[in-house]
Amino acid sequence: MSEQGESGAMIGAEMTVDISQHLLETMRAAYRRQRMLAERALAQLLPADWHVRLDPESNSVAIIVRHMAGNMHSRWTDFLVSDGEKPERDRDGEFRPGEQTPEALTEEWDDAWDVTLATIDALEPDDLLRVVTVRGKPLSVAEALLRQLDHYGQHVGQIIFLAKHLRGASWSSLSISTPPRDG
């Protein structure tokens, strides 16, 4: 019996797509899920929350958003034909506190996600075993997809943690609400 997985691909004994196509569809859905979770957390922030740092060594939500956007532009622009670490990227600058408004950061974020998802959506199953380079290191496209999904998941988790911390009692759960705690 077959059923539809979270990505929309058929799974089970009568699988109608090959494993490469299934992996691509699953990865596309996972990237979109990371974006959605981050955006649901970002939507709960007040403008002043974006630049709060828990301590001098911590990143604010604004820094994390700027870093993710810089990483996405670098990794996904000309993904199949150029190194994923572009010379014009100012990675160190992504981690300097700035004064960008939430609107400007959201525009940068949306643009970066547009590049990312357009690139991933354009991939074909045969591309998964092609070799790309990131910081001079050869990786299969499948490895690069998984590596970036892991990286983004870490930062999305940071965004969610910070947003939940900053919003306190006004936080709206992104999934199943936790039961009230005693004491």
Which residues does each PLM region occupy?
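Short, contiguous alpha-helical
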Residues: 2-6, 10, 14, 24, ...
